[in-house]
Amino acid sequence: MSSNQPRQTWSNRLTYILTVAGATVGFGATWRFPYLVGENGGGAYVFLFCIAMLVIGIPMILVENVIGRRKGVNALDAFGGTMNGKPVAKVWKLVGWMGLHGAFGIMAYYMVLGGWVISYIINIIGGNLDISSPVSGEVTKSFFTEHIENSPWEIAFYTFLFVVVNQWILVKGVIGGIEKAAKYLMPLLFLFLIAMVVRNVTLPGAMEGITFYLKPDFSKITAELFVFVLGQVFFALSLGFGVMITLSSYLDKNENLVQTAVITAITNTLIAVLAGFMIFPSLFSFGVAPNSGPTLVFQSLPIVFSNMWAGPVFAVIFFSLLLIAALTTSLTIYEVLITTIQEKTKIRRAAAITIVLAGIFIFGNIPSILSYGPWKDISVFGKNIFDAFDYISGNILFMLTALGSALFVGFVMKDEAKEELLYKGNHTTVNIWFAYVKYLVPLVILLIFVSNLF
């Protein structure tokens, strides 16, 4: 511990699960998962995603939970101190540093997506995006170009507004702020999600979309696709940038880590699958292509809503759902950096929050916003700044942090890692998990890493 004060713990298992679920759903489940399903064979992708949760998802949740609870400190110091009575080599701190940089990278563009969503909500309510009657793809594309790509100051304002909402919750602390927010926001998210699913699966022609979504076309399943899906699980579960390590550092020592890991994976998968039920039946009902990629939510779905009874109302509900998912995730990613700065420097929490939020807004959010306008000609690795943040954090830093975490558990923590699970676990099961994490998981992560780069 970095403080003489005992560390807070979550009020109960339910609030921890809700907080972790909020950390993992975000845009990964509500935006990224559906468009990747549409691009990669529908049911085939869903089938592989469920397999990937078992192969890499649950084992890696346990890796980060074991590190976090055992060390009980921030995501940087978790890779330091002593283990098994011996000092941990300082080189392991590099794993923590990569995770922190990954957290910065994802927040650099993630908050901007939140700004986009707020823009859609306000413009739909205000009538600037009029979907009260059927519109074409040209209309939604024109709106995206005018109000998202070519309106940097408008998006900067909405992004700043989203940052302020995060700040208002974060100043209340981990338990009083993040936990309490998850306690109310996650049930609201489920309510909105169920309402949208019920509405869309009852549309005429919805069954065609459900079939596309649930019936795997095994001819589309390839080794390359499976490796790709394995990589997406890291994004879906917020693995590799310190979120699970930070959140589990507040876990009670009596909590069953295996059960919480399984529940976390099931909850994330359930929300992602429900998001698909919310989207694909409506796409097929109104003849909109499901494989429109990242623009699916922002350009294709408004066409669907414009053809739907009470479309603007359901559109506002949908984008509000996205905003809630983004908020519950952004709070926990911010917390990774806030906890680290607060514990390393001993400054007040309010000061740490200001440093993190202002720093990311100035050096991450603003460049990401400008990359669609005045800075569109600036490229990093052949990508604009917005996409470069995504690529570097998602394909490089997350993978290397996850690899380092697995190796840290297997070769540094060793018996201490097993002890965290043996209290509530079976010896045989724990030994199998440990061997799997020590030898096989690093190979899987290396395979994903190389595949992402080449």
Locations of the language-model features?
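Membrane-embedded translocation segments of transport machinery
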Residues: 2-6, 179, 183-327, 351-352
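C-terminal membrane-solvent junction of multi-pass transporters and transport-like membrane proteins
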Residues: 95-100, 346-357, 388-445
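Select transmembrane alpha-helical segments in multipass membrane proteins
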Residues: 9-20, 45-48, 89-104, 156-160, ...
